[in-house]
Structures are given as structure tokens and as C-alpha cells.
UniProtKB/Swiss-Prot annotation:
It comes from Oryza sativa subsp. japonica. Residues 1-17, 54-64 have a biased composition (Low complexity). GO terms for molecular function: serine O-acetyltransferase activity. Keywords: Acyltransferase, Amino-acid biosynthesis, Transferase. GO terms for cellular component: cytosol. The gene is SAT5. NCBIfam families: EPS_EpsC. Homomultimer. This is Probable serine acetyltransferase 5. Pathway: Amino-acid biosynthesis; L-cysteine biosynthesis; L-cysteine from L-serine: step 1/2. InterPro entries: Hexapep, Hexapep_transf_CS, LbH_SAT, Ser_AcTrfase_N, Ser_AcTrfase_N_sf, Serine_acetyltransferase, Trimer_LpxA-like_sf. It catalyses: L-serine + acetyl-CoA = O-acetyl-L-serine + CoA. It comes from the Eukaryota. Belongs to the transferase hexapeptide repeat family. One of its GO terms (biological process) is cysteine biosynthetic process from serine.
Length: 340
């Protein structure tokens, strides 16, 4: 159930400010505030003027339709975090540090990613500045963050709130880190982009090459074991389950990875190899090995994968966009009507 937040009046804003001050005062002794170092190499400071990045290196996502959508999602995240902090005091300090102490979604996600991906030699302060610079300079990246949050909330029945996705869904976090590494790759800052890819693979078990082009409205459901190769392209509103590989054939060079159209659904354990095209609205069955092009709104299953057709010879086409409907198994329930 979504938590709807009305606009605060001036009096309610003062109450909220008082509650925030009270919460900070009630934090356990020794617990760092959002601007203080934690003693373990991670600092919570926020830069005053993050360095800008040239717009031409960013994928051509559409900017937000309005600032209201991002603001609304952020208001839901904060409301959910306040509710959960009240209900579970053990999480209060964590929720304050990651969400409630930040004035915006870009700062919150930059802080959270930095502390997830830092190491003893790759400091959280450096990563925080890096993430925040990208999200601040490029509205298109922020639009993609919002679209991914909305995708998880609408498609994943296990997602009970935006804050759960932001804080706990490693597929979502891996995609946002990839967006920044893609910017670095296009800027020719390739050693840093590859270092970030390596940290994402270590922490989230998701391996996406920085050169891969990924759209918005992406759901990596469960996400463990997802591999996306260097020249792969993933369109908008695509849903990918765990242990999916978008790989090369092992011997080709150059443009050698799959091209995934908008609204595609790729089932768990599927492998798509080579520079093949998966058309918009196509569905790839779980465990399939795809070595051929799949036309738009068709379903491919099997090893090696083949297109599903009806017994009358007609090719079965989905009427909806599987990447959004998440319909994995309708072709199995009606199996007697189909041939492979």
C-alpha cells in the first residue's frame, strides 16, 4: 500500500523539524550523524558544489516529465522511512543516515551506494562525490532512477514500498551504479569505470560492462548472477530475472552482444548469445538458450530456443508487453494449443 503524503503546512513543517531534531538527540551514543565520519573510513559529509559532467556523455534518456514525479516518489520514501523507524527502533539510525537526513533522492541514493560499494582503498567519500556529481548534473539519470523505482513497485509483488527497493533491492542498486560507470566510460575515465564495475560484481553479484547501454524502467528481479556484456543494448521497461546472461559467442569481436527491445521479459536462467535482436514485447522463457533473432511480441523457449506457434501454424504473439505484465507462464498453462 502506498503511503500518500500531503503537502505540509507551515505548522506541520515546524512539527516535522522538531521531530527530526528530537530523533537526532535520541540516537544512541557514539552513533555518527549524517555529516560526521563513522570511524571506519566512511564519511557522511556532503559536498557543497559537486563537479559537473558534460551532458553529451550521458545516454539519451528523456528528462523527467516534471519535477513533481521525482518529488512525489521522494516524499513516499521519506514517509515510509519515518513509519519504519517508528515501528522498528533497531532500524532508526540506519533509516536516518540513509534517507531521513538527506534533502533529496540523489543525495540519499549517492550516500547509500557509496557506503555499499566502498572498500578500505576505495573510500566512500570519493564514491559519494562521484555519484552525486552524476545525478546532480544529469536530470536524465534521475529520471531513470525514478522510472526504475516505479517499475519495481508496480511489477514485483514482493516490493512493499519505494524505500524497500531503494535500500534493499540489489538489482536496483546495481543498475544505478552502472549508469554512473557508463558515464565514466564515455568520459574515457575507463579505469575508474571498470573499478566500479568490479565493486558492483563483488557486492551485488551483478556484472554489467560499463559500455553496455541500459534504458530506464528496468527491473532486475532478484538479480543474482545477471551478466550483461560490453556491446549489449537493453531498451526501456525491460524485466530480467536472476542468472540471465546477455553474452557473446566467445569468438566474435566488435559488436557481439544481444540487443533487447522495449518491454521484453527474460525469464530466470535464460542465456542470449551473440549479436541477436530480441524485438519489443518479446518473451524469453526461463532456462532458454537463445541464438536467433526473436521478432517483436513473440515467445521463445527451449535449448536451443525456438519460437512458439499455434497448431494452425500461426505464430503466437503477446497482446501486452511482457516486460511490464510479468506474465511468465501463460504459454505453459495453454500448452496443448501450441507447438514448438
Amino acid at each position: 500500500m502506498l503511503v500518500v503524503v500531503a503537502r505540509k503546512s507551515s505548522s506541520s513543517a515546524r512539527v516535522a523539524a522538531h521531530q527530526t531534531r528530537s530523533h537526532r538527540a535520541a540516537m544512541p551514543a557514539g552513533q555518527p550523524h549524517a555529516h560526521e565520519p563513522d570511524g571506519g573510513g566512511a564519511s557522511h559529509r556532503r559536498p557543497q558544489s559537486p563537479p559537473s559532467l558534460p551532458a553529451e556523455v550521458v545516454p539519451a534518456f528523456a528528462p523527467p516529465e516534471s519535477e513533481d514525479e521525482e518529488s512525489w516518489v521522494w516524499s513516499q520514501i521519506k514517509a515510509e522511512a519515518r513509519r519504519d523507524a517508528d515501528a522498528e527502533p533497531a532500524l532508526a539510525s540506519f533509516l536516518y543516515a540513509t534517507v531521513l537526513s538527506h534533502p533529496s533522492l540523489p543525495r540519499s541514493i549517492s550516500f547509500h551506494l557509496a557506503n555499499k560499494l566502498c572498500s578500505s582503498t576505495l573510500l566512500s567519500t570519493l564514491l559519494y562525490d562521484l555519484f552525486l556529481a552524476s545525478f546532480t548534473a544529469h536530470p536524465s539519470l534521475r529520471a531513470a532512477v525514478v522510472a526504475d523505482l516505479l517499475a519495481a513497485r508496480s511489477r514485483d509483488p514482493a516490493c512493499v514500498g519505494f524505500s524497500q527497493c531503494l535500500l534493499n533491492f540489489k538489482g536496483f542498486l546495481a543498475i544505478q551504479a552502472h549508469r554512473v560507470s557508463h558515464v565514466l566510460w564515455a568520459q574515457q575515465r575507463r579505469p575508474l569505470a571498470l573499478a566500479l564495475q568490479s565493486r558492483v560484481a563483488d557486492v551485488f553479484a551483478v556484472d554489467i560492462h560499463p559500455a553496455a547501454v541500459v534504458g530506464k524502467g528496468i527491473l532486475l528481479d532478484h538479480a543474482t548472477g545477471v551478466v550483461i556484456g560490453e556491446t549489449a543494448v537493453v531498451g526501456d521497461n525491460v524485466s530480467i530475472l536472476h542468472h540471465v546472461t546477455l553474452g557473446g559467442t566467445g569468438k566474435a569481436v566488435g559488436d557481439r552482444h544481444p540487443k533487447i527491445g522495449d518491454g521484453v521479459l527474460i525469464g530466470a536462467g535464460a542465456t542470449i548469445l551473440g549479436n541477436v535482436k530480441i524485438g519489443a514485447g518479446a518473451k524469453i522463457g526461463a532456462g532458454s538458450v537463445v541464438l536467433i533473432d526473436v521478432p517483436a511480441r513473440n515467445t521463445a523457449v527451449g535449448n536451443p530456443a525456438r519460437l512458439i506457434g499455434r497448431k494452425n501454424g500461426e505464430v503466437e504473439k503477446d497482446e501486452d508487453m511482457p516486460g511490464e505484465s510479468m506474465d511468465h507462464t501463460s504459454f505453459i498453462r495453454q500448452w496443448s494449443d501450441y507447438t514448438i
